[in-house]
C-alpha cells in the first residue's frame, strides 16, 4: 500500500503522534517511554513558550490506515536571527524500518521548510539544542539518560538514505566513581587555589529561590555557550518553564554555582537519571504511577552531567576544576556510581584527550544531520503570529547589540527584518570539563 503523509490537525492525530513511539520500539529494550502528559504539553503551541518565536508542523506517515512514522518541521526565528542563519529544523522523528515512509516524511518536512525560505534542513532537534537532540549512531545497547534520545540503529540508514549528511558528531563520555583517584590529583590543586587566588567560591543552588537561581545559571550559560553550534539564548518565558520543570527532579547537591563577588562565573548541573524511574511508569503517573516513581527514585544510581560552563574571562582560572571536584565529592556522598558527561564535539581533539586522561571513555555518539535546500530569501508566513514576528526581530536586535557595531553589527541589525537576512556563520560545540582542552581549565560542556 502507498504511503500518505498528512499534517496533524485533529485531537486524535495528536494522540497518534504522541503514542507512535510505543508502536515503534520493542518493549523491554533500551528505549524509555516519556510521560505522555509532558509530551502533549511540549507539542502544545499555546502552552510551550518556544512558539512565541517559532512555528512548526507535525506530520504523520500512514500506510493502509496505520501510522508508521512521524516528524516535526519547525523554524526557530529567534535562532536564525541570533545566528544569522536560515535553518529549518526537524525533530521528533520516529519511523518503522520503512525507507519509503521515512523518505516521504522527510520530503514533506523539507517542502514545508522550503516554503518558509529556509536554505538548510538541520536536525534532529526536539525543538532545539536545549532539549533532546541528535541522532544516536553509536551506543545502541545502553539506555538513554534523562533528556537524551534513543534511536534504533536503522534510523541512521533512513536519514542518510534520504540524502542527509553529517553536520556535527558529538561524544558522550562515561565516568565511574572509581576513576576519582585518577582524576583528582590532576585537578585538585587548581581547585584548592580557586578561592585564595581568584576569589571564586562554589556553592549549591538554593531550591527555595529556584527561579532566581535559574536566572543566575542562565547568565553563565549564555556567556559560555554563546558561540556554540546551534545555540540561541532562552527567553524569559522559557527560563520560567525550565525552572518549573526542574523543580521536581533537581537535586541541589548536583546543581552548582561558582561566584566571584556575588556574581555567577561558572555553573555545573547534574541530573539524577530519572529515566530509571520513567522506565517503570510506561508514560503515566496516574493512577498508581506516582507510587512506583517514589519507590524507584530512591534507587537511582546514575547521573547525567548536563552542563558545565565558565564565563570566558575566567576560563583559565581553574573554575571548571573546582566544579568538577565538587561533583566527584557529591558522588562520593551519594548512591551514584556512574555518570555520563557531554556532549563533546568529535573533532575537539584537546578536549577528548583530556577526558581520556581522567579515565573517561566514549560510550555513545550522536549526530546532527543537514541537507541543503533551494536558495530563496528567508521569510515569515503572512499568517505568522505577531508575537513570532516580534521575537524574530528582538533576536536580531539582541544579536546586533552583542556585535557592538561595525560590519557585524550592521549585518545583525539588518536581520531585524525577518524578511531580509543573510547566510550565517557556524559555531563550535565545546564540551565537557574545559573548552580549551586542558583538564580543569574552563570552557563549557554542551547541553543536550
Segments predicted by a language model, with ranges:
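Acyltransferase donor/substrate-recognition loop-hinge adjacent to the catalytic core
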Residues: 149-230
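Short linear/disordered segments characteristic of secreted peptide precursors
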Residues: 395, 426-428, 438-440
Amino acid at each position: 500500500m502507498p504511503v500518505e503523509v498528512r499534517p496533524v490537525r485533529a485531537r486524535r492525530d495528536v494522540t497518534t503522534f504522541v503514542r507512535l513511539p510505543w508502536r515503534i520500539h520493542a518493549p523491554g529494550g533500551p528505549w524509555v517511554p516519556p510521560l505522555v502528559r509532558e509530551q502533549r504539553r511540549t507539542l502544545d503551541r499555546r502552552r510551550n513558550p518556544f512558539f512565541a518565536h517559532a512555528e512548526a508542523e507535525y506530520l504523520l506517515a500512514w500506510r493502509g490506515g496505520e501510522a508508521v512514522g512521524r516528524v516535526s518541521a519547525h523554524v526557530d526565528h529567534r535562532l536564525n536571527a541570533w545566528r544569522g542563519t536560515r535553518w529549518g529544523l526537524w525533530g521528533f522523528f520516529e519511523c518503522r524500518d520503512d525507507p519509503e515512509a521515512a523518505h516521504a516524511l522527510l520530503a514533506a518536512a523539507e517542502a514545508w521548510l522550503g516554503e518558509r525560505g529556509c536554505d538548510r534542513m538541520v536536525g534532529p532537534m526536539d525543538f532545539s539544542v536545549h532539549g533532546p537532540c541528535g541522532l544516536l549512531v553509536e551506543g545502541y545497547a545502553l539506555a538513554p539518560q534523562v533528556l537524551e534520545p534513543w534511536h534504533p540503529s536503522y534510523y541512521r540508514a533512513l536519514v542518510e538514505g534520504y540524502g542527509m549528511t553529517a553536520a556535527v558528531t558529538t561524544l558522550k563520555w562515561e565516568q565511574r566513581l572509581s576513576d576519582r583517584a585518577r582524576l583528582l590529583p590532576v585537578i585538585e590543586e587548581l581547585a584548592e587555589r580557586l578561592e585564595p587566588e581568584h576569589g571564586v567560591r562554589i556553592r549549591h543552588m538554593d531550591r527555595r529561590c529556584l527561579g532566581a537561581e535559574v536566572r543566575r545559571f542562565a547568565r553563565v550559560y549564555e556567556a559560555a555557550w554563546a558561540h556554540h553550534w546551534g545555540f540561541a539564548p532562552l527567553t524569559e518565558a522559557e527560563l520560567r518553564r525550565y525552572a518549573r520543570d526542574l523543580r521536581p527532579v533537581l537535586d541541589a547537591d548536583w546543581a552548582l554555582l561558582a561566584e566571584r563577588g556575588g556574581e555567577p562565573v561558572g555553573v555545573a548541573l547534574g541530573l539524577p537519571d530519572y529515566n530509571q524511574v520513567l522506565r517503570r511508569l510506561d508514560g503515566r503517573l496516574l493512577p498508581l504511577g506516582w507510587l512506583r516513581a517514589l519507590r524507584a527514585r530512591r534507587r537511582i544510581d546514575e547521573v547525567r552531567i548536563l552542563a558545565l560552563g565558565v564565563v570566558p574571562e575566567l576560563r583559565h582560572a581553574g573554575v571548571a576544576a573546582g566544579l568538577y571536584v565538587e561533583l566527584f565529592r557529591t558522588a562520593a556522598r551519594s548512591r551514584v556510581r556512574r555518570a555520563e558527561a557531554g556532549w563533546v564535539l568529535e573533532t575537539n581533539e584537546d578536549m577528548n584527550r583530556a577526558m581520556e586522561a581522567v579515565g573517561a571513555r566514549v560510550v555513545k555518539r550522536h549526530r546532527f544531520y543537514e541537507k541543503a535546500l533551494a536558495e530563496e530569501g528567508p521569510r515569515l508566513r503572512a499568517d505568522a503570529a505577531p508575537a513570532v514576528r516580534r521575537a524574530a526581530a528582538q533576536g536580531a536586535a539582541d544579536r546586533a547589540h552583542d556585535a557592538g557595531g561595525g560590519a557585524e553589527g550592521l549585518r545583525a541589525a539588518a536581520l531585524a527584518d525577518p524578511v531580509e537576512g543573510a547566510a550565517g556563520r557556524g559555531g563550535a560545540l565545546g564540551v565537557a570539563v574545559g573548552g580549551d582542552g586542558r583538564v580543569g581549565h574552563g570552557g563549557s560542556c554542551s547541553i543536550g
